């Protein structure tokens, strides 16, 4: 389903089908999402759901479907709380989509006309809060703080003391022995190796600036801010995803990086070919890494 909505987002921008299929593959099987997609552990399921729900929220924001967009966003937050950071980007897309149809409307006009569309989101959020309070006596607690690895930790689940080591792991290649990479079983590895779409996004930003092309600078900066804040936030977590291959917590950022990339894609497919080796590198690393994870 996530791949379907990835393709639908690309087609919304009138990108030809061949290119749309390629970038759908780059985001999915060419990234560390390939690892999480094959695993039925409950936290992997939650992350896969957040991935798809975030893409659905983005798609319906582009289509000016406020109710659906924010409802799916609320569901994504329920799966992965840091998806709450996507809200400014969704509101920006919704605002632009509404203005394309109603150019004279101001923000207050949009609110007056469409406030009822917020009801599904509010109901979903309220249901989460009621459930959390009933189970743990706290509307924001959903059980993670009660896991043994966090209750036994002196610093708890989140602490800035974890950030330095986690940031280092996030940008480090695996250690080598005899010229061969050693398998990284936990705590993450270089995000540019396991999810090369991060490289694609940065290159397309540089391309747009170098060529002095017109692009949505506000949205580009917004996407960068969301990605950076979420990256730093997850590095404050004790485990960075526990046992897995790659760097699965950073997979939560893939949907926002994807829409940021799509916005910057040139209409003439210029520079598309540089993504091909990135895709094959991402596919090979994640395929081999995923197989080794399950056979070890």
Task: Give residue ranges: language-model regions.
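Membrane-proximal envelope and lipid/glycan-remodeling enzymes
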Residues: 1-296
């Amino acid at each position: 389903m996530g791949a379907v909505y990835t393709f639908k987002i690309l087609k919304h921008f009138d990108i030809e089908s061949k290119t749309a299929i390629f970038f759908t593959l780059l985001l999915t099987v060419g990234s560390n999402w390939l690892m999480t997609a094959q695993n039925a552990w409950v936290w992997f399921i939650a992350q896969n759901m957040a991935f798809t729900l975030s893409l659905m929220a983005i798609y319906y924001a582009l289509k000016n479907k406020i109710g659906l967009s924010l409802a799916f966003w609320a569901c994504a937050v329920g799966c992965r709380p840091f998806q709450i950071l996507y809200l400014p980007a969704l509101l920006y897309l919704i605002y632009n989509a509404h203005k394309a149809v109603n150019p004279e409307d101001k923000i207050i006009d949009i609110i007056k006309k469409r406030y009822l569309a917020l009801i599904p989101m509010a109901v979903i959020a309220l249901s989460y809060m009621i459930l959390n309070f009933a189970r743990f006596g706290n509307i924001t607690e959903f059980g993670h703080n009660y896991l043994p690895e966090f209750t036994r930790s002196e610093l708890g689940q989140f602490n800035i003391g974890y950030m330095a080591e986690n940031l280092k792991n996030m940008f480090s290649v695996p250690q080598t022995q005899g010229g061969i990479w050693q398998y990284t079983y936990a705590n993450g590895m270089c995000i540019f190796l396991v999810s090369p779409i991060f490289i694609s996004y940065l290159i397309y930003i540089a391309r747009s600036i170098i060529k002095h092309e017109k692009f949505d600078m506000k949205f580009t900066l917004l996407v960068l801010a969301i990605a950076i804040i979420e990256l730093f936030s997850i590095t404050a977590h004790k485990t960075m995803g526990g046992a897995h291959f790659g760097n699965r917590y950073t997979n939560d950022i893939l949907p926002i990086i994807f829409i940021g990339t799509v916005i910057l894609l040139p209409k003439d497919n210029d520079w598309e070919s540089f993504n091909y080796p990135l895709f094959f590198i991402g596919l090979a690393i994640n395929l081999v890494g995923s197989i080794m994870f399950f056979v070890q």
